[in-house]
């Protein structure tokens, strides 16, 4: 009898819904004997569990100093959008400024989730304070509270769906906040079976077997960064 192998994947909620479904579907069809187990958690939890070897691969959305024993690989860039109900005053402003945004209560991600640290820093650097009244780990929850009128939402742009979110307006916020980066990582020294290489490449096509092997061979963060310095990441 063939023993099913297990791939333990850890990621945060929005990645599970907006970037992984097609990849997972393709993967499980190609490797029907590999049991795919996904955990949804915070970025810090992802990094910590990968560092302990409790999961094979982790995904997270913020630069972190944790997990020094991980091979950390950038996958793609992502942007933020402001979401408001139709008819909201912000929807009529040609180019929103942070000062405009600071006049309203804000609904966004929990601190440490999907680049919320960068959001706080953007306001601070301009001498402003974000009036965050509600936080959640899930973009769908944030959108629900925006529809209720609790506040203005700030979410990952990929989390907005024109078909499902017809009551809301999405306003690009690239000029207000730096782009975020989604990373993938695994514990240094992990033996990567062929199906793990395949999954990594399905999720981030620039992470070829050759590039991943180079990343694994590095001894320092500086060397690891050099592996990816000439690679232009796609934006989602």
Regions found by a protein language model. Give the residues of each.
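Single conserved hydrophobic/aromatic residue that forms the stacking wall/gate
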Residues: 1-8, 12
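Secondary-structure junction motif
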Residues: 91, 105-126, 192-201, 207-220
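Short helix-loop capping/hinge motifs at secondary-structure junctions, enriched
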Residues: 87-97, 176-178, 189-194
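Flexible hinge/capping segments at coil-to-helix
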Residues: 69-106
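Short beta-strand-to-loop elements that line the ligand-binding cleft
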Residues: 34-41, 61, 129-138
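Short alpha-helix C-terminal cap/hinge motif
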Residues: 9, 15-39, 48, 121-125
């Amino acid at each position: 009898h063939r023993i099913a192998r297990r791939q333990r994947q850890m990621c945060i909620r929005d990645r599970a819904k907006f970037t992984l479904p097609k990849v997972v579907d393709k993967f499980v069809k190609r490797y029907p004997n590999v049991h795919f187990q996904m955990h949804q958690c915070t970025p810090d939890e992802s990094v910590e569990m990968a560092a302990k070897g409790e999961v094979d691969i982790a995904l997270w959305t913020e630069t972190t100093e944790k997990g020094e024993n991980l091979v950390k690989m950038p996958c793609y860039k992502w942007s933020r959008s402001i979401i408001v109900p139709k008819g909201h005053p912000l929807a009529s402003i040609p180019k929103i400024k942070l000062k405009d945004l600071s006049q309203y209560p804000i609904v966004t991600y929990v601190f440490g989730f999907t680049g919320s640290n960068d959001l706080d820093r953007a306001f601070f650097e301009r001498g402003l304070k974000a009036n965050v009244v509600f936080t959640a780990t899930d973009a769908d929850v944030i959108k629900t509270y925006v529809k209720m009128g609790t506040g203005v939402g700030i979410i990952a742009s990929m989390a907005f769906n024109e078909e499902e979110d017809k009551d809301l307006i999405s306003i690009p916020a690239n000029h207000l906040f730096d782009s975020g980066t989604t990373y993938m990582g695994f514990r240094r020294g992990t033996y990567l079976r062929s199906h793990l290489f395949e999954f990594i490449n399905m999720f981030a096509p620039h992470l070829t077997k050759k590039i991943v092997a180079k990343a694994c061979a590095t001894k320092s963060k500086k060397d690891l960064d050099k592996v990816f310095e000439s690679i232009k990441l796609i934006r989602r």
